[in-house]
Amino acid sequence: MRFFQKLLTKLLVLFSSIVIHSQEVDFHPPIDAPFNLSGTFGEFRSRFHTGIDFKGGEGINVFSIEDGYISRIEVSPSGYGKVVYITHPNGYSSVYAHLSRFSPDIEKYIKSEQYRSKSFTVKKFPKKDQIQVKRGELIGYSGNTGRSFGAHLHFEIRD
């Protein structure tokens, strides 16, 4: 019995070391303010919180953490309010939610879509080459849109 336990342990260590790999990442800070958090990943509210919330007032600069393209933009009176999703070459995507407004280029794009659809609420999926962003590029400003209880940036990294 002990032989099988030792064998199983060795096999688990061997296979887990093959599967585990590290990817060094050095992201640009998503917000131009001290990293004071008002909400953390996994805390339970009415459901589990899926990101981190950076405290701050409305209108604080929000930046792309890495090069990529905007793969989704939404404006809604509920949920994330004004939100940007960026897909990065490393396979991650980053989410920036409850924005008070978008950067001028994104704002222009989304306003034209709102007028075209005659709706405040829009959900757009720009093509990969349509809205490229660079690491550290301004994408919006912190806010209190959607289902939010105070100005902040809700931020997520997804894989």
Task: Please provide the spans of the model-predicted regions.
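Histidine-centered catalytic micro-motifs
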Residues: 150-157
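Histidine- and aromatic-enriched segments that form or immediately flank copper-ligand environments
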Residues: 92, 96-101, 105-114
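Surface-exposed acidic, glycine/proline-enriched linker/cap segments
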Residues: 106-129
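Residue-level signal for short segments within beta-strands and strand-turn junctions
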Residues: 88, 157-159
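Surface-exposed, glycine-biased beta-strand/turn segments
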Residues: 20-93, 100-102, 120, 129, ...
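Bacterial Sec-dependent N-terminal signal peptides
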Residues: 1-25
